[in-house]
Amino acid sequence: DVFRMNGHDRHRIRLRLGMLAHNLLVEEYPLAERDLAPDGESHWLLETEVAGFAGVARFVAGLLDDVEIVDSPELKRYVADYFRRNAAVIAD
């Protein structure tokens, strides 16, 4: 997938990205550019399929204030579970 993950399962995701998230996505994952569409003056929508949530979740977690998960409840649960599992690490 565009986040360089592989596997047989496919999950459709949709993210709304601010300018920072958009620029970092295109720089770090150039294949994502084909799945991006403008959404107003300073936002973009990424609609793509991923092989697993680990790669995209890492991207979302690092830019949480500039990425909105849209119509992707499985990804929302994955990210929320990731933060719950690791809460002790960031609480110390």
Regions found by a protein language model. Name each.
Residues D1-D92:
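Polybasic (Lys/Arg-rich)
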